[in-house]
């Protein structure tokens, strides 16, 4: 149930690279406080708008999507380290040198390269092919800007939003480098929203259909449900990891070490899966209609996964390895 | 040592499973004792039989005379409510009741209730499925129809041909209408109405039955609030008015009783079968101009009641003794009805014309007394150990807490007491006392006997439950040992079993069971994906294990294997819509194939050419089916013979191959066996389901490439069996049993062969998966096979026990006969045939036996 942009397939490196470590919430008070509030805020929003959601799912989902994206962007920019924001990394300056072509192109290089070289692979040789493909994708995105009419507004909205987040910077600065933080945060945010719209939404929609969402009817519902889930799962993942091939391979295999970001993403999907449970009941309630329970499950799963990933399960991986074969098992007895 | 012991425990557990089913079933489906023979008038107490008030009966029956249709203000029955200047009901010419129809509210059991007066059991419903079964007819049961015929009367029937099936050869004139075309709202009824004017002029019949289907069809098709409903009610009303006018005018109809009754109602959706208030509350009207003398006054139309109980509520079974009494017939032996007290008043006035008695009291009392004696006979038949002799009157009657049968006993003793006390001279006070004592006894006995029909032998239920519980505990520890070693898969299985077991207690989840399997199997796909996608770059590919058996196709699809599986599951999920809630939604067989015939045939030919080495034979199959229809049977048999020969060959070839040399030869015998079986299953499947076997093949290919561990193979096999059963259109409703392929190659009806073919055609997909996964596991050693059986047994025993527990705890649930009992029947099939015969016996290596 992982959200999977096709980048892993492009970046099938022969070596098994060491993965990125689990992500910590930024160690300042505002971040820590907001990280506590954010999932509650999302659930409160859902609870508040629940009746409207039941009354007209499509309109409600559509109108709330920008708000959700905004909230998520605010959250990631407040609480999470953007892709490439390495504390112990000075190669980020060398990455800046790659900025040669267009404005946007250069910034994407800024986002990606440090993530690749510095933070993610402290002690291992970098995966060139992964890096290359990642850059390629971003270039492609910039060359062919998103065609969709409603959703591209989010990046701009997030840009408009930045003054708000800027206020957080003085406190941030106590722990982090001051210069360029705003830019460093803005660009991964834009990238994450773009990729969420273009890649994660279709992937999650397809997953929803594979898991039994109607194929021939309810298209807007499924798509919007997929979009909401994509915003919940992928915004933070992309913001934090960029298009790091090895991370996305782990996501595809659902074996990221648990942290708030991955826990929330996995929790969203598992929650959506459990959200299907009440649908067959014969209670004939309006909220049993298709996307509502799934979405509620996803939101609850998000919050639960978020909390668990931060705390109890932090750093643990979902592993499926059997300890022995039957014969061995018998011998053990 | 330990291995040997666990082997025996598994064997014992598998023996316990059918035993627990037998014990539980004997308690759950109690056999109802029916008295045989026909009732005759007895001349004992009082020495007098109340004379019949009527000598003819005209029964107008229409499905769905839900009482609010007839009685409420929104009803279209204007005439029934209003007659001339007055009202039919208000004038007292019609005595209105609500007749409680107990579940199952489908036509045939209801007709049984109306004619015999007995309460049909769930077994009747099962027996009714086997249409060829003639034991479900009422030819040899005591009914008021049979009594009327025995008296020399002629019977006439127009309408629903269920009557003709129930009473073959009983009717003098009849014109049956099949209710096959549910969308026909008019012709079915016109076919009845056109006979009425003629029949009303005839004076040879003594019972004239009209059974209209239009209301039923409209209900099924458009629901109770459809615009067709009100016009149909007006049409019915005009029939009532026509008949009533004839009753008033025609001389030979002067002593005719006109009964208008519904066999069952309908729920809000327009369907019936269950026991919601709407379904169990049909209307009952006794109409005759004679009733006006009773001067009963009822308001009509009445206010709408939410519980639909209009006027006095009686049991539907009460129709039988009432009709019998009014017509002067003996009450049918097995009737559990009570003469409707309101109609006793007929003898108050009728007595004036009969000079024999000084007062009307005796007739009323005699009527009730006869009813009581008949019911007492039925009670004695069911409770032979209880005595009803007066001299043995026990003291228990004074105690407060009486069980039902004791209450009946005491009521009867009270009757005897009052009868003895009053002696022969009935003054009005004494007779009213006797009457009330009799009615008390009758009601108690009716309650007792009606519940006896659905009365469970609780001890047997618990014994059955504990036997299956014991089977679980036998398998639990060996299975737990296995599952702990495969922790994630074991946890998944545990989760699946637990959630399934809790699900069995919710009626809608039982109805929508397919959703659970689709849901859990997608979870399993994710599990496989996480495991094997992880393996890919977790550099543990060396885990190849022994060469993967005989499975012919083995492309490596490690990366997107699970995704492809997910897609194939999605296709299967939509193959057939099943269950209740979403059954009407479009699916592949129902919506896609009809409009894409070419695709279907292309897929069919693809499926046929899928087993290349048997192309000759598979080519034969359609040819055999398509040549001349004269010898279709012969051809089908030939194909069956060919297939069975191939199967036997494959078994022997396997033996030969083992003994001589290994390797060589592209198609190992076990594969040939599987392919032959596939061919046979294709033949036994619905045409539209055949292409699904292609999907299965894709799935097994992917699964083969995954190198699953033992427990994973077992879980996969298990999930696939259930998923594909539902994907092929199976459900937990008895109506979904497909018998279209049950007669392939059979000339005459044989319970055993037809039963086996019915099972195979309904369980074709699970059987295929058992065979395919066996092939997948062909490299397994003995311990692994044993582990497979252990886990399967644990799963089956747990499912069985949870279904039994659900049936036991929910035995008074509204849906016990419509949802839980069918589920229990299906579980029997899963456990007895699919688990024990197909899975467990299929696991035994038959080649070992041949070697000996």
From Swiss-Prot, chain B:
<feature type="transmembrane region" description="Helical">
    <location>
        <begin position="750"/>
        <end position="770"/>
    </location>
</feature>
<dbReference type="GO" id="GO:0051267">
    <property type="term" value="F:CP2 mannose-ethanolamine phosphotransferase activity"/>
</dbReference>
<comment type="similarity">
    <text>Belongs to the PIGG/PIGN/PIGO family. PIGG subfamily.</text>
</comment>
<dbReference type="InterPro" id="IPR039527">
    <property type="entry name" value="PIGG/GPI7"/>
</dbReference>
<dbReference type="InterPro" id="IPR002591">
    <property type="entry name" value="Phosphodiest/P_Trfase"/>
</dbReference>
<dbReference type="InterPro" id="IPR037674">
    <property type="entry name" value="PIG-G_N"/>
</dbReference>
<dbReference type="Pfam" id="PF01663">
    <property type="entry name" value="Phosphodiest"/>
</dbReference>
<dbReference type="InterPro" id="IPR045687">
    <property type="entry name" value="PIGG/GPI7_C"/>
</dbReference>
<feature type="transmembrane region" description="Helical">
    <location>
        <begin position="516"/>
        <end position="536"/>
    </location>
</feature>
<keyword id="KW-0472">Membrane</keyword>
<feature type="glycosylation site" description="N-linked (GlcNAc...) asparagine">
    <location>
        <position position="191"/>
    </location>
</feature>
<comment type="function">
    <text>Ethanolamine phosphate transferase involved in glycosylphosphatidylinositol-anchor biosynthesis. Transfers ethanolamine phosphate to the GPI second mannose.</text>
</comment>
<feature type="transmembrane region" description="Helical">
    <location>
        <begin position="676"/>
        <end position="696"/>
    </location>
</feature>
<keyword id="KW-0812">Transmembrane</keyword>
<feature type="transmembrane region" description="Helical">
    <location>
        <begin position="824"/>
        <end position="844"/>
    </location>
</feature>
<feature type="transmembrane region" description="Helical">
    <location>
        <begin position="632"/>
        <end position="652"/>
    </location>
</feature>
<feature type="glycosylation site" description="N-linked (GlcNAc...) asparagine">
    <location>
        <position position="576"/>
    </location>
</feature>
<feature type="transmembrane region" description="Helical">
    <location>
        <begin position="458"/>
        <end position="478"/>
    </location>
</feature>
<protein>
    <recommendedName>
        <fullName>GPI ethanolamine phosphate transferase 2</fullName>
        <ecNumber>2.-.-.-</ecNumber>
    </recommendedName>
</protein>
<dbReference type="Pfam" id="PF19316">
    <property type="entry name" value="PIGO_PIGG"/>
</dbReference>
<dbReference type="GO" id="GO:0006506">
    <property type="term" value="P:GPI anchor biosynthetic process"/>
</dbReference>
<feature type="transmembrane region" description="Helical">
    <location>
        <begin position="787"/>
        <end position="807"/>
    </location>
</feature>
<keyword id="KW-0256">Endoplasmic reticulum</keyword>
<feature type="transmembrane region" description="Helical">
    <location>
        <begin position="486"/>
        <end position="506"/>
    </location>
</feature>
<keyword id="KW-0325">Glycoprotein</keyword>
<dbReference type="GO" id="GO:0005789">
    <property type="term" value="C:endoplasmic reticulum membrane"/>
</dbReference>
<keyword id="KW-1133">Transmembrane helix</keyword>
<keyword id="KW-0337">GPI-anchor biosynthesis</keyword>
<dbReference type="InterPro" id="IPR017850">
    <property type="entry name" value="Alkaline_phosphatase_core_sf"/>
</dbReference>
<comment type="pathway">
    <text>Glycolipid biosynthesis; glycosylphosphatidylinositol-anchor biosynthesis.</text>
</comment>
<feature type="transmembrane region" description="Helical">
    <location>
        <begin position="714"/>
        <end position="734"/>
    </location>
</feature>
<keyword id="KW-0808">Transferase</keyword>
<feature type="glycosylation site" description="N-linked (GlcNAc...) asparagine">
    <location>
        <position position="420"/>
    </location>
</feature>
């Amino acid at each position: 149930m992982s959200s999977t942009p096709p980048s892993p397939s492009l970046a099938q490196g022969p070596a098994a690279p060491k993965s990125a470590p689990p992500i910590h919430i930024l160690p300042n008070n505002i971040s820590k406080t907001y990280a506590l509030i954010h999932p509650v805020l999302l659930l409160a929003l859902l609870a508040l708008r629940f009746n409207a959601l039941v009354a007209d799912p499509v309109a409600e989902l559509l109108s709330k999507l920008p708000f959700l994206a905004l909230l998520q962007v605010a959250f990631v920019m407040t609480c999470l380290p953007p892709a490439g924001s390495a504390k112990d990394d000075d190669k980020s300056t060398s990455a800046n040198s790659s900025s040669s072509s267009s404005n946007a192109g250069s910034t994407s290089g800024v986002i990606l390269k440090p993530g690749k070289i510095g933070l993610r692979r402290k002690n291992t040789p970098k995966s060139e092919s992964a890096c290359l493909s990642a850059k390629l994708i971003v270039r492609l995105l910039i060359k062919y800007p998103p065609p969709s009419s409603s959703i591209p507004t989010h990046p701009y909205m997030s840009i408009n939003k930045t003054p708000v987040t800027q206020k957080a910077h003085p406190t941030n600065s106590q722990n982090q480098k001051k210069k360029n933080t705003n830019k460093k945060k803005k660009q991964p945010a834009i990238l994450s929203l773009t990729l969420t719209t273009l890649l994660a939404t279709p992937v999650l929609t397809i997953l929803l259909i594979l898991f039994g969402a109607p194929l021939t009817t309810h298209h807007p519902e499924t798509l919007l449900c997929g979009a909401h889930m994509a915003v919940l799962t992928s915004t933070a993942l992309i913001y934090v990891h960029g298009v790091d091939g090895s991370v996305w391979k782990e996501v595809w295999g659902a074996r990221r070490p648990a942290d708030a970001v991955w826990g929330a993403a996995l929790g969203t999907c598992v929650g959506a899966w459990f959200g299907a449970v009440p649908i067959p009941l014969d209670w004939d309630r309006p909220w049993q209609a298709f996307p509502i329970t799934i979405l509620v499950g996803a939101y609850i799963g998000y919050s639960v996964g978020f909390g668990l990933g931060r705390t109890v399960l932090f750093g643990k991986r979902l592993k499926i390895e059997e300890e022995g074969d039957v014969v061995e098992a018998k011998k053990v007895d | 040592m330990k291995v040997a012991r666990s082997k025996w425990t598994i064997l014992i557990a598998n023996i316990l499973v059918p035993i627990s089913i037998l014990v539980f079933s004997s308690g759950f489906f109690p056999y109802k004792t029916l008295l045989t023979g026909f009732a005759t008038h007895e001349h004992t107490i009082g020495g007098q039989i109340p004379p019949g008030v009527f000598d003819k009966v005209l029964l107008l029956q229409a499905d769905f005379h839900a009482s609010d249709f007839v009685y409420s203000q929104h009803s279209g029955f204007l005439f029934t409510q209003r007659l001339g200047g007055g009202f039919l009901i208000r004038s007292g010419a019609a005595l209105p009741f609500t007749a409680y129809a107990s579940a199952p509210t489908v036509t045939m059991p209801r007709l049984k209730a109306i004619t015999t007066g007995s309460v049909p059991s769930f077994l009747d419903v099962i027996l009714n499925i086997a249409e060829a079964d003639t034991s479900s007819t009422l030819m040899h049961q005591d009914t008021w129809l049979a009594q009327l015929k025995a008296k020399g009367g002629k019977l006439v029937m127009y309408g629903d041909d269920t009557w003709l099936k129930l009473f073959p050869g009983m009717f003098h004139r009849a014109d049956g209408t099949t209710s096959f075309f549910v969308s026909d709202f008019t012709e079915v009824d016109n076919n009845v109405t056109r006979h009425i004017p003629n029949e009303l002029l005839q004076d040879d019949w003594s019972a004239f039955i009209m059974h209209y289907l239009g209301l039923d069809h409209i209900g099924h098709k458009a629901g109770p609030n459809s615009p067709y409903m009100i016009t149909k009610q007006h049409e019915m009303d005009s029939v009532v008015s026509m008949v009533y006018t004839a009753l008033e005018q025609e001389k030979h109809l002067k002593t005719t009783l006109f009964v208008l009754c519904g066999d069952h109602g309908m729920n809000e959706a327009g369907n019936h079968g269950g026991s919601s208030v709407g379904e169990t509350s049909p209307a009952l009207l006794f109409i005759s101009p004679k009733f006006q003398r009773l001067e009963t006054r009822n308001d009509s139309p009445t206010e709408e009641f939410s519980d639909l109980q209009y006027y006095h509520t009686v049991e539907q079974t009460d129709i039988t003794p009432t009709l019998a009494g009014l017509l002067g017939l003996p009450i049918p032996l097995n009737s559990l009805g009570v003469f409707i007290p309101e109609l006793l008043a007929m003898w108050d006035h009728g007595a004036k014309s009969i000079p024999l008695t000084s007062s009307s009291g005796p007739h009323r009392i005699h009527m009730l007394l006869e009813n009581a004696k008949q019911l007492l006979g039925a009670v004695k038949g069911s409770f032979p150990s209880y005595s009803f002799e007066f001299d043995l009157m026990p003291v228990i009657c004074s105690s407060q807490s009486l069980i039902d049968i004791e209450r009946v006993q005491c009521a009867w003793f009270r009757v005897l007491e009052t009868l003895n006390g009053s002696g022969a001279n009935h003054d009005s006070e004494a007779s009213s006392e006797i009457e009330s004592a009799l009615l008390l006894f009758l009601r108690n006995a009716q309650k007792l006997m009606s519940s006896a029909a659905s009365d469970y032998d609780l001890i047997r239920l618990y014994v059955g439950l504990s036997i299956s519980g014991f089977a679980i505990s036998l398998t639990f520890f060996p299975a737990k040992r296995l599952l702990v070693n495969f922790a994630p898969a074991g946890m998944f299985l545990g989760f699946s079993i637990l959630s399934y077991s809790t699900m069995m207690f919710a009626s809608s989840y039982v109805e929508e069971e397919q959703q659970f399997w689709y849901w859990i199997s997608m979870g399993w796909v994710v599990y496989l994906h996480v495991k094997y996608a992880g393996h890919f770059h977790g550099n543990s590919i060396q885990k190849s294990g022994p060469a993967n058996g005989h499975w012919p196709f083995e492309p490596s699809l490690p990366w997107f294997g699970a995704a492809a599986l997910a897609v194939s599951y999605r296709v299967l999920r939509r193959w057939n819509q099943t269950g209740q809630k979403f059954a009407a939604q479009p699916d592949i067989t129902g919506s896609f194939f009809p409009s894409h015939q070419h695709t279907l045939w292309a897929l069919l030919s693809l499926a046929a050419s899928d087993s290349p080495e048997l192309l000759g034979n598979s080519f034969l199959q359609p040819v055999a089916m398509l040549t001349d229809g004269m010898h279709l049977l012969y051809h089908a048999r030939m194909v069956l013979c060919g297939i069975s020969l191939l199967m036997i060959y494959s078994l022997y070839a396997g033996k030969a191959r083992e003994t001589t040399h290994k390797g060589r030869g592209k198609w190992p015998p076990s594969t040939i066996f599987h392919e032959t079986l596939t061919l046979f299953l294709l033949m036994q499947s619905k045409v539209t389901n055949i292409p699904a076997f292609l999907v299965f093949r894709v799935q097994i290919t992917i699964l083969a490439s995954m190198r699953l561990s033992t427990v994973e193979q077992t879980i996969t096999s298990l999930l696939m069996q259930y998923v594909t059963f539902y994907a092929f259109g199976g459900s937990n409703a008895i109506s979904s049993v497909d018998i279209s392929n049950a007669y392939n190659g059979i000339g005459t009806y044989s319970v055993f062969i037809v039963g086996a073919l019915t099972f195979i055609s309904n369980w074709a997909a699970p059987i295929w998966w058992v065979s395919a996964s066996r092939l997948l596991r062909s490299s397994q050693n003995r311990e692994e096979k044993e582990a497979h059986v252990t886990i399967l047994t644990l799963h089956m025993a747990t499912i069985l026990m949870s279904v039994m527990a659900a049936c036991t705890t929910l035995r008074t649930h509204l849906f016990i006969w419509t949802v839980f009992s069918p589920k229990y029947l299906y579980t029997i099939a899963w456990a007895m045939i699919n688990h024990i015969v197909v899975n467990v016996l299929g696991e035994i290596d038959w080649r070992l036996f041949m070697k000996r």
